[in-house]
Every structure is written in structure tokens, then in C-alpha cells.
Amino acid sequence: MANIVHSKNILIEFTRTTNIPGWLKELCYRTIDEGYLSKKSLKEVCDIFISDGEAVMQEPQEIGTEQLILSKLIHTAGVNALVENSEIVFCPEGITLLCGSNGSGKSGYFRILNHIGGGFIEEPLYPNINEQNPKAMEVSLEYTVNGSGIQSYDCSCDEQEREIEPFSRITLFDSLYANEYIRECSHNTYHLRANGYFDLYYLRQNLRRLRNRVGNICKDKVPALKVHELAKLNMDVIYEEYVKALAIEFKEELKKLINRSLHVEILSVNFEKNRPSFTVRLDKPYHVNEILSEGERKCVSLALLFAEIKLREDVNPIVLDDPVNSLDNEIIQRFVNRLLELPNQIIVFTHNYWFANMLMEAKNVNVYSINSGIAQRTSSKKHLFAYKVYSHRNEKGLIVEYGQENSSFHLSIVKRCLERMPFVNADALIAADHLRHAIENLIDEKIFLNLTYFRSYPL
């Protein structure tokens, strides 16, 4: 595998070793932090340039020097119709699986992580529309960095809290991402947010915008923006090396998923709405949609995702929402095998019970209780926490540990409903729902002894 250095680190090293002015150092720091600069940030850099001041921002942390681990997500109130005071304890050293039917509310939790982590596709968070006076959004995320003590971040889910450190290191993927990655157009393109090398292109764009701004304010200062030191970055050469390495890894990852070689060539990078996308060409003169099935197009987007993670040697969390839509069972099995090879902390939301059982029953997986301590999780196999996500009436995102949604669990909810004072009609409806589930579970537990038939598949 090629030795690829993250472009954020290249920019940091550039600011250290070169005697550059304060405004350029500030421009590099803000590009690392924001990518394509906001108008406010661009104005602040421009002010430093005009005043010939020093950089204001602190030097960012190098990528790869810190590892983020998510410990717990707590939803207190206010996001969509998610039940209040719900929490998900993540498996820090393995996989966290959350399985629930469509409409159960599991994607609400993904959207929280997508918002905080700054996912490529913005999926808005709304207050609970079932309430006349919706509560403010309250979310907490517990995490560690480099194994340090647990820290907590309280989030109200507004726009200013999108893509903030250290959560911008999370890799996020869902079905909407796949639809964006594989889209039929004139050049057979699909879109992947590449976190490895586009900082250099953002810097070039931000510098051009800064020149335009300075030119509108004081043209006589524009010549001072010609920075010969930038030539040392060799942006085009660095990017060419990255694309070649990515193409090799991409083809290998694709073959692992669909079990056959596709002649796919990564040509170049484009920018649409300030977001980078790869242009992809098939060797044969057909459109992508005529060559690949819907499931295989999904595989292409997943393969690119895995290729870049591998190329960057990224060990930060990966969060996937329904990644196996449209995939047949053989491809799902290969996808499971690939997930189990990754060293990252992985969080998976899915409504596919076949996929969930493949993960939980794989030979090299050990399912642990969420109450188990790290000292108890001694197996050399991949560790996994599993949850069931379900809904009742207008309550979404109810969480129970997988396998614990038994008759006793449902009867305990019935008991709580019957003990509520005052007892209202809504309590009766919820109690009736859970009583029916309790009876169904009792039949499974006492008559069928929890035996379930699954079609055999290779492990």
C-alpha cells in the first residue's frame, strides 16, 4: 500500500517549516478546520492580511495523532419523535449493532451523529411534530480521545454544532450517500467526500477568493498575495499520487464485495457546490446504470469508502445506516466479512434482520452484554453490542438490548402502565400493545423454546 500522508498534516508541516506571513498561516489553519471558508472566516483572514498581523488560530492537531472513541449517546429530549431519556452505550473496541424495522426511529439516532460529525449529506433534525409545544433539542455524546478519561459534549443540534472537533473524524454512510455516489450523468460520476487530500484544493480556492476580496478593497495590496512558497506544496503531484493509490485500493475493495473485477478508472476531481467528487469511467462504453445492478452500485460506493479509510489508515469511528439495502445475501456475507476485518469502532443501524444475524452469529464474533466491563470482554474475537430499536404509537427509538425484548420485558411495561396515576386511555393502548407482544414472546419462549429457523449460509 502506498505511503499516503494526510493533506491536513502536509499543510501543518508547511506552516512550520516555511517563513510565511501570518495571514497565510491563518488561511492554512482555517482551511484545515473548515475546508471551504465561510464569508465570515474569509473576512477575518483578509483583516489579518491588510493589517499585516499574526495568525490568531492555534495550530490544529495532526491527523492520526489522536483516536476518537464514542462511548455513549444520550437523547434527553426534542429530536424528531425519539423517546425522551434514551441512551445507546457503544462498544468501544468493536461493533455496535442497532436493528429495527422501518419507522422504528433508528435513523433518528443516525441523524444526530450525522449532524455532529458533519456528514457529506445534511439530513435536517426537526423537533417532535407530535407535540403542540415541542421541547428544545437536548443530546449528550460521551467520548474519549486517545484513551483519556471520558468527556461529555452537550449538543442542542443547531447549525453551529455541525462538523465540530473531534467528531468531524467520524466516517458516515447511509443509503442517501450511495445514491449520491452513483448518479448517472454525462461523465458517469459518483460522489465521495474524500477527507484525505482535498484540503489542498480548498486552500487553492480560498486563496483565489481572498485575492478577489482584497482586489475589491485595496488593489495595491494584491501583489503581496503572490506567495512563491506555495509552489513547495506540489499540489498536483501530491494529488496524482493519491488518485493512483486510491484507484488500486478501490479495485481491490470492490472485488472483495462483488467477487469479480470491474474495470473502473478514477480520472479526476471536480467541485460541485464546493464539494469534491471523483469522475469515474468504465472501460466499456456503457452507462454505470447499464453495467451495474442497484446492489452493485451500492457496492461501488462502499468500496470507495473502505478504500479511502484503508489508504488513510484511519482508525476513527465508522457509522453506517442501512448499508446493505439492495444487496443479495452473498454480497451481504462478504460485506460482513469485510466489516469484521476493520480495526475501527463501527456503529451499524439496519432493518435487515438477516444481516443482523449474520453479524451476531459469525464465527469470529462474540456478543457481549452492554453491562459487561472491559475487563470481562476478554475474547480474541470481534466484540459486539446489539440492540433492538422499536416504536409504539408516537414514540420512536425505544432501545432494548438484543435478546432482552422478551415476555418479562413487555410485562414490566404493562405493569408500569397499569400503575400510572391517573390512568389515561393512552396508557391502556400502550399496555394492550405490550401485552400482545408478551403473549407472542411467551409462545416463542415456552412452546418453541426460542428456536428459529434460518436458511443456512457460509460463515
Residue ranges and their predicted role:
Residues P92-T96:
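Pre-Walker A (Motif I) flank of P-loop NTPase domains
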Residues V315, L327-R334:
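Conserved D-loop/post-Walker B switch-helix segment of ABC ATPase nucleotide-binding domains
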Residues L98-S107, S277-L304, P323-L327:
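Conserved ABC ATPase signature
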